[in-house]
Regions:
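Structural detector for internal amphipathic alpha-helices that build alpha-solenoid repeat scaffolds
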Residues: 1, 14, 18-34, 42, ...
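Amphipathic alpha-helical scaffolding segments comprising HEAT/armadillo-like alpha-solenoid repeats
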Residues: 1-12, 33-45, 64-76, 96-113, ...
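Eukaryotic acidic, Ser/Thr-rich intrinsically disordered low-complexity regions
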Residues: 180-207
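Short linear sequence motifs
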Residues: 2, 78-80, 107, 124, ...
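Short inter-helical turns and helix N-cap capping residues of alpha-solenoid HEAT/ARM repeat scaffolds
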Residues: 16-17, 47-48, 78-79, 118-119, ...
């Protein structure tokens, strides 16, 4: 998108205003200019949780090295959701940069971090993201995550069925209908009526 001088001025002048910060992060998502990503990086330090997480997510649309470094630091956040979004945006930025050496390095680093990561939520976001970039072996890992998190002792502690639904919807394509439907059948006994209705009406899947 071409730079809008008026919007640029408004955002640079007022982006710390508490009433508009959240809207600013959403608006800046569609801007690729350096000034926009610079503001978003600043907003990843925001004390408002929603503003911060929106900024982390929006950085994923860019390809700046500074954004890559900031996101890598945020993967150490104690906040599970901030950490999760930082991982996904980090993958997006590396793929946007499209340097083979960086992609190989990121995958090696991510594999080591993944083994040490205790957050099942993070894994349920990261694995579909990798699958979306063509790493088909990620689907096998997703199946393992589904099997593990559908155990009653785990689902009573953390119900990730909504995340599983959205991940399957994201990964669905013309070549994997059967696999997607098999996973949906696995989680069906754990779904409530709202979730079943979403799959049948919004996603047009018959389960």
């Amino acid at each position: 998108m071409k730079k809008n001088n008026k919007l640029h001025f408004i955002i640079k002048s007022f982006h710390w205003n508490p009433d508009i910060r959240e809207k600013v992060t959403e608006e800046l998502c569609s801007y690729e200019e350096r000034w926009a990503k610079r503001i978003l990086r600043r907003m990843t330090y925001d004390l408002n949780w929603i503003v911060k997480i929106n900024a982390v997510e929006s950085l994923g649309t860019g390809q700046e090295l500074k954004s890559l470094r900031r996101l890598k630091k945020l993967t150490n956040s104690k906040d599970e959701l901030i950490r999760t979004y930082a991982y996904v945006s980090l993958i997006d930025v590396v793929m946007n940069r499209a340097h083979d050496s960086e992609i190989e390095g990121m995958l090696y680093w991510l594999k080591r971090r993944y083994r040490r990561e205790n957050s099942e939520l993070m894994k349920l976001f990261v694995v579909p993201a990798l699958y979306g970039y063509g790493y088909e072996e990620a689907f096998i890992e997703f199946q393992k995550l589904v099997n593990r998190n559908l155990k009653m002792e785990n689902i009573c502690k953390n119900d990730y069925t909504w995340r599983m639904i959205h991940a399957l919807e994201y990964m669905s394509n013309d070549t994997n209908h059967r696999q997607i439907e098999e996973e949906l059948r696995k989680i069906k006994p754990f779904l409530n009526n709202v979730q079943k209705n979403y799959i049948e009406t919004e996603w047009n899947k018959d389960i």
